[in-house]
Amino acid sequence: MPIISRIGSKSWKVRLVYFTISLLLTLGAVTMLYPLMLMLAGSARSEADTDSIKPYPQFWFDDVVLFQKYVESKHRGDLEKVERAWAKRIGSWRRIARPDDDTTYLADFLAWRDKCEWWYLGHWDAWRLLAINGRAFRQQLHERFNGDIFAFRDEMGVPLKSWTKVGPPNPQLHQRYPLERVGMVGAFADFARTRPTRDRVLFNPDGHFWSKYLLPKYGTIEQYNEAHGTEHTSYRQVFLSRFVPENELEREAWETFVRTELFLGHIRLSPDLRDAYQRELAKKYGQRIEEYNKVHPGRDYTSFDQTPLPTSLPERRDEWVDWEDFIKNHEACPAEGIEVHGPRQQFESFVAQRRGVALETVTPIRLPIAAADWRDCMHNSGHLRWEFTTRNYKYVLDYILHHGNGIRNTIIYCVLAVGLALLVNPLAAYALSSSFALFEALSDGGWRGIARKVSASKTTKLEYV
């Protein structure tokens, strides 16, 4: 029977009471759900959107925030790497906006970038969490070694105790020498070639030149213009030229950076420097060709006149130091014999050939890396939103599954708890009811009373239990 009768419920006062109760219950539910939604939204945040306090992930509906998280993920959560790739000052993830780069050569760039040989894979590590490519690489190794961490350790030479510690090797960006592709480095290089081209981060020597040399020395573009007598509006108009500039200050900056900082794979030497290279080798090894042969196994030269000059980074690693020492020597290796041949120079040659024009008519071309990143992000927005929503959960689940026996122990505990509850409780209830009947029978006539009770309650006892 209801507390309020049907007749009473027709009164507007009663209806107002109903409405008030419903409103209070709804508000109570909201006060419980809103913090839960904030917590769930927070579980999908990263450094790029950590300031967002909303009951839903902001990147679900905001393309700019999605792009910020995309750039953060692609560049391993390192803002300096983004600035070097884009060759521009950013300062904060929240300041990243839709690029306003010139898209004249964007289509050419998208057609060329899979031919570029200088890149590393992105989307694998950010803020101590493995991103999609990092998780895929770990899974590939896990399947390759059938989950045997000891077999993995023996072959790769990495002393790790758990699969949760397995991840891609650090690429050590902007070092002078390329990494030797053995062990984990080789395995990751093979894996990287199987991933989409859009996940590649291209090396940008112009950005490296700006961040490593120009920015620390001159600071603002106004100070650079004052020193060089130029009228650039930003550092994006300053390039690392293919050949040494004629301007004295520009020449000094170019030589310092190219000779001491630039990745050796981006340097080409003129064949005319062969005699100078041979003289430098003879001087370095004390005019003793046998010493040179000893340092370079497999060589059997009888004179330094037989030693070749590699015009690009030698294939043999034991020749790299000799080659670099020669480049650093201002007297032996004149700057006019050095050429920079990096991704931009390769792209400029591609554009000139594709359009059938002279190279001089298109140079220099600023690599539209930021514009390509925006295009890739927008073309894969659905996949990226799902990845950023579930990434943290996937990482935690992967950690639990591959770290100890937590899942197995939990399953065993749950099975035993449920099984014992279903088995012990009925048995205890049956035993309790039997004890009660026995006590009642004893108090009602001893063993004869027991016999009467058993006969009378033969069926009802089962129902009771």
Please identify what each model-predicted range represents:
Residues 54-395:
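Polysaccharide-binding and catalytic clefts of secreted carbohydrate-active enzymes
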Residues 401-434:
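Transmembrane alpha-helix signature in integral membrane proteins
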Residues 40-57, 78:
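Alpha-helical transmembrane signal-anchor/signal-peptide segments
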